[in-house]
């Protein structure tokens, strides 16, 4: 398998509604995604990218039943972005109430097999970016704050209650 994405994967359609309001200095984009679609995870034991643990004594059973959020109005994803293009500086602010597309993997052993199930959790996102010309260079900065983002634990911790974490990512460059 190749590490680079195929062009078809990059241009994949998304079931979403987008609304724009803009003028020469400001743009507002609102987004609503009524359906959930998580990542397609490789679960075949022969696949080197498989998310299932290797060399286990128990037979592994992948079970996705009931793991995805149900198709309810309360489960939709929504967000917005407000961009400004002003003399000497561009900046934007964004927020998103979404589902983490990468599931937490839970492990439940019973008898001679272990059931492996994906679990999806809600998360929030707040972010912003800024661009400022400095002579022939442009100073650019971005920041993202993820609220209640869940990460996969070691398989031994799969039976424990999972909790979300708040994370901050940022980048500044010229």
Where are these regions (language model features)?
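Residues that define the transmembrane beta-barrel architecture of outer-membrane proteins
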Residues: 11-15, 22, 74-78, 122-126, ...
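Transmembrane beta-strands of outer-membrane beta-barrel pores
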Residues: 23-25, 32-38, 86, 95-101, ...
